[in-house]
Regions:
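Short coil/turn segments at secondary-structure boundaries
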Residues: 36-38, 123-124
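Short, charged/polar "capping" segments at the starts of alpha-helices
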Residues: 28-35
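Active-site-proximal specificity loops/subdomain of glycosyltransferases
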Residues: 40-103
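Short, acidic, metal-binding catalytic loop of nucleotide-sugar glycosyltransferases
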Residues: 8-21, 37-40
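Short internal beta-strands
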Residues: 23-27
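Amphipathic alpha-helical segments that form well-ordered structural scaffolds
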Residues: 14, 33, 94-98
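GT-A fold catalytic core of metal-dependent nucleotide-sugar glycosyltransferases
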Residues: 83, 87-140
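N-proximal low-complexity "stem/linker" segments adjacent to membrane-targeting elements
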Residues: 1-7
């Protein structure tokens, strides 16, 4: 089932309210929505990078991925199509870019899906409860 960005933005309020430095990659047409949803007192801790998934580095491999799906079919999950795979893999390019640019002079980096609460309200609650534990035990 194909969903556009507005579907995921419906579930972004909790994530965008977290009191953390955030670098947010989004399709250009959603940039203003991100700024509207991110509380104003956190704007100084926010960098939005409007970029289309089509402009991410991994997209150059689309044809190769499509060919791999033909040669090695995998029907377990109907999301197993090139565009979904590219979207998922784009996070690694995005995270690498943030680490290299380091706009907030950070020592720790992580990825969180903007719609984490969509996958279960407890996800965001547990994230907030355990962030210090995660930093202390799983980060350098």
């Amino acid at each position: 089932k194909e969903r556009d960005g507005t579907y995921y933005l419906k579930y972004a309020n909790g994530c965008l309210s977290l009191d953390y430095n955030m670098v947010i990659f989004c399709e250009p047409e959603y940039e203003s929505s991100i700024w509207e949803k991110r509380p104003k007192h956190l704007h100084y801790r926010t960098k939005v990078i409007p970029i289309s998934v089509e402009d991410m580095k991994m997209t150059k491999y689309r044809q190769k991925i499509i060919q791999n799906r033909i040669e090695h079919p995998y029907y377990f999950d109907n999301r197993n199509i090139a565009s979904y795979y590219l979207l998922c893999m784009a996070r690694y390019d995005a995270l690498k870019r943030v680490i290299e640019e380091n706009p907030f002079n950070s020592t720790h980096f992580g990825w969180i899906n903007i719609c984490i609460e969509r996958m279960g309200p407890k996800n965001l609650e547990n994230f907030k409860k355990n962030d210090n534990y995660i930093l202390k035990n799983f980060c350098c």
